[in-house]
Each structure stands twice: as C-alpha cells, then as structure tokens.
C-alpha cells in the first residue's frame, strides 16, 4: 500500500540546499582569492614580455646603420615603432634611467610592477636618450614609442626614444 502523506524528506531538502550553497560560496571565494593572488604574476609576465621584445628590437636596431648627428644631410638611422600596453600594476618602465636610484646604466631598460623591480641590459656601449633630454618614463597605459639609432662625431651610440608621430 502506498503512502501519500510521506513528508520525511521535506526537512532534509532545505538543509541540503543550504549546505550546497555554502560549499559553492566557499569554492567561489577560493577561486576569487586565487585570481587576486595570480594577478601580480600575470602583470609582471606581461611587462617582462613587452620589455624583452623592446630590448630585442633595440639590439636589432644597433646592428643596422645609424643616423650621424653631425651631418645634417645624413639619411635617417634605423628606426622602429614600439607599442606598449602596460597593465594597471606597472609602476614604471624606463629607458636608460632607474627612477628608484636616480641613476642607473644608460643602456638598460628598467621596470617595476607591484613592487617587483627588474632591469634588462640592451647594450653596454649604447645609451638611451630622448630628443629633448628628458627621461622616458612610462606608467600603466598604452603607448607608441619611436626608437631611432643615431651616433655622434665621437662614435658614441644612442637610441633616441620619443613619442611616435
């Protein structure tokens, strides 16, 4: 004989729903914490990749012909437009200048992402310069920079960094 007034499971259904909801909430919280902890590493990897590409491009430029600064009629030197899309955690990306120390080697790219600082050697015999003599310092955001290889009458090599035209 079948019972139609069986309500034994009626009390366990809400308890099961609450327990499942709590477990799902805990899993979502753990995933959110994992993503928050992974964000600095992802941002650093992005800047690592972009700075490495820029250093490789600069080394390539240094293997080509420079523009001679002492000859107004000289043809343009080897030139490259570089695009940077720096993530939110980027404190700086600098060419030939270390903002933390106020100096640094002029042939290096310095960058700092969420407190993690790195430096890449481009060339020990070359220097980064800007046409107006200021320091090129980028923060988070999107940038297009023009880098041109030039040399002076004494044979000193420079990579001129300016905003792309």
Residue ranges and their predicted role:
Residues 2-38:
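N-terminal single-pass transmembrane signal-anchor helix
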Residues 17-21, 48, 75-76, 123-125:
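Generic detector of short, locally flexible boundary/turn motifs and exposed helical patches
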Residues 40-51:
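Membrane-proximal amphipathic alpha-helices
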Residues 50-66:
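N-terminal alpha-helical signal peptides/signal-anchor transmembrane segments
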Residues 53-57, 82, 130-134:
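N-terminal start-of-chain detector that recognizes signal peptides
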Residues 61-89:
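Short, glycine/small-hydrophobic-rich surface segments
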Residues 85-165:
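Intrinsically disordered, low-complexity regions enriched in Pro/Ser/Thr/Gly and acidic residues
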């Amino acid at each position: 004989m079948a019972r139609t007034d069986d309500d034994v499971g009626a009390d366990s259904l809400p308890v099961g729903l609450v327990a499942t909801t709590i477990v799902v909430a805990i899993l979502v919280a753990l995933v959110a914490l994992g993503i928050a902890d992974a964000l600095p590493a992802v941002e650093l990897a992005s800047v690592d990749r972009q700075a490495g590409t820029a250093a490789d491009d600069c080394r390539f430029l240094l293997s080509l012909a420079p523009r001679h600064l002492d000859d107004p009629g000289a043809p343009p030197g080897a030139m490259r437009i570089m695009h940077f899309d720096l993530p939110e955690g980027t404190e700086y990306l600098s060419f030939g200048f270390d903002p933390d120390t106020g100096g640094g080697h002029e042939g290096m790219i310095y960058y700092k992402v969420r407190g993690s600082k790195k430096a890449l050697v481009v060339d020990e015999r070359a220097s980064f310069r800007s046409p107006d003599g200021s320091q090129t310092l980028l923060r988070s955001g999107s940038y297009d920079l023009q880098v041109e290889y030039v040399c002076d009458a004494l044979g000193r090599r420079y990579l001129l960094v300016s905003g792309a035209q």
